[in-house]
Amino acid sequence: MPSSISLENLESYMPNRSSFRMNFETKSINDFSNYAEEFDKEGAKCFVDSDNVSAKIIFDIGTEALPEHQRNTAKLRLDKTAAFSRLLSVNGERFNQKEAANFIEDWGDFIVVSTSSAEAMTIAQAANAITKLTIESARSLTSEMDDFSEHMSAMERVEVKNKDKMPSNIDFTCVPYGGLDERKFQIKLSVLTGGDKPQVSLRIVKLEQHKEDIIEEFKEILVGKFEKSELKTFIGTC
């Protein structure tokens, strides 16, 4: 074919499209399932993206004998809630005493705090205990570690001293993504004493397991929404 000649799609000049196709996007599980119910057809599949807590339906996959163009789709992407976003932002981070106390106070409606012996603390007690932390250093040959003291195997012994009981565990309960159930996350609070002033480290316990459970819950919700149709749901992308 000569280079001066090009092929053009004449669909725009036709009274109708050559095939039905839409790219519907939403953040609502109910709207996603309602749309899927209306446009469901033979061969359609739903794929759940475990990395982004999202789902995509391809309606015009067709069959092995009669494959279609895969241009008619619906996408669902769930947003993280503000509480869950904040929770993830503190995981593995180090904070000074004021920052750690502020986190506990600011998100007190979502938090239950306890000591290492499982004794409950109020939000005010926990924040106050953190802000009053002090460090004493001494020379020692001993080596020992617990929740709130670290004795180096070298010569220095550093201990956290505080007259109040210290918070050790934080239960942070929130809805992680819009449309999912409330979930409890356990945060382990550790005091780091390597410098002149103590730092507080927060770590979410079994975070990866929580992420897997969230995806399974998401998939189960979609499967339940599609139970009246033949639409199959898979974890993966396409």
Model-identified regions with their sequence ranges:
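Surface-exposed polar/charged interaction patches
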Residues: 16, 20, 35-45, 64, ...
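Intrinsic-disorder-associated interaction segments
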Residues: 3, 18-29, 77, 93-97, ...
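Amphipathic, membrane-inserting segments
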Residues: 48-51, 57-84, 149-238
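Short N-terminal edge-element motif at the start of the domain
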Residues: 84-96
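Generic detector of well-ordered alpha-helical segments enriched in charged/polar residues
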Residues: 11, 30-33, 37, 58, ...
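Intrinsically disordered, low-complexity segments used for protein-protein interactions
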Residues: 3, 37, 55-59, 102-109, ...
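An N-terminally focused, membrane-permeabilizing/fusogenic/translocator signature enriched
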Residues: 1-68, 229-238
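Membrane-inserting effector segments that mediate pore formation, membrane fusion
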Residues: 95-149
